[in-house]
Amino acid sequence: MKNRKALALIAILALVAVACGGADEVVDEVEVETTEAPATTEAPATTVAPSADPLVLASLMPLSGDLASLGPGIALGAALAVEQINAAGGINGQPVVLIEGDSGCDGAVALTSLNDVIAQGAQGVMGAACSGTSLAILDTAIAAEVVMVSPSNTSPQFTKIDKKGFYARTAPSDLLQGDVLASLLVEDGVQTVSIISRADSYGRGLAEATAAAFEAAGGTVKTIVYHATDATEFSSEVTAVGKGGAEAIVGILFPETGCGVLQPAFEQGLLDTPWYMTDGVKDAGLASLCGLGTALDGFKGTAPGSAAGEAKDAFEAAYAGVSADGSPTFIFAPQAYDAVMLMAISAAANGVTGPEIASG
């Protein structure tokens, strides 16, 4: 007979798929009716002996660096998942432990934090946020047999590398976002575009995917300008984008360095050109962060979303209950929730913690 706490956990885990599907995907709902057989006829069940150790997970989000304005909101999605799991009885009869670490959107910072959380017993990591950061620390996680599930790694590069079964992501590849962004440009009647992008795995992957999809749809890419991720001055890159003379500009940026791009763009009069942004700057506070007031009004963009339905509604109600401002969601917070739930499902299903989580 199943433990009632396990049934409660299953109800919580039904929220998991909030972010894994696209807006056009339909998930069939299946009702399962359960009944208890009489004691005299109940067949013996095969069970897995639960681990005596608690499930220890780590949240490795950018609490400093270029994505610091997004990190806490994403991490809150993971914390919400742990809170709900523990309210339902935990995993294998014990509360899940969540350790918070800072990835800094920087390989060196993230590696230090990863080693620290591993030393504290972390068996799974929700993170990192930045694609390049995850690429920098993945080999260390694999060597330690620690599962990494990222809520926001969108670089197409992850599809190509050998992850040894210790890496997954709950956000879609930018091959999809590039196609959607190109479609948006075409729908708006844009025929020529210039792109300014970060020179990292995220930026290059999305810029190339967008350019390929836009050209396949009959558009023309005037120029692609990449900026160094550690740069502090971007005027020359902005000037180069402006010289392209395109009808629209695509910005594949992060908040802090993105402000370094948008400020000279404002000074050079380029913000009068239609801009299309991506998930890296999906932050309601971007204009304030950049000190640009209403200059960004009218910008359009793309970002991974969640399929409409009961699961999405339930997540947003729960997230609003724990967020400081009552916001129902935050970019990649649903995917962070899913990442933790997936690791928890594996641990619960297999009655284990540690490297065996990867087999789930």
Region locations from a protein language model:
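Bacterial N-terminal signal peptides that target proteins for export
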Residues: 1-7
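Sec-dependent N-terminal signal peptides
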Residues: 7-14
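Extracytosolic ligand-binding ectodomains
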Residues: 2, 21-360
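C-terminal motif of bacterial Sec signal peptides marking the signal peptidase cleavage site
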Residues: 16-19
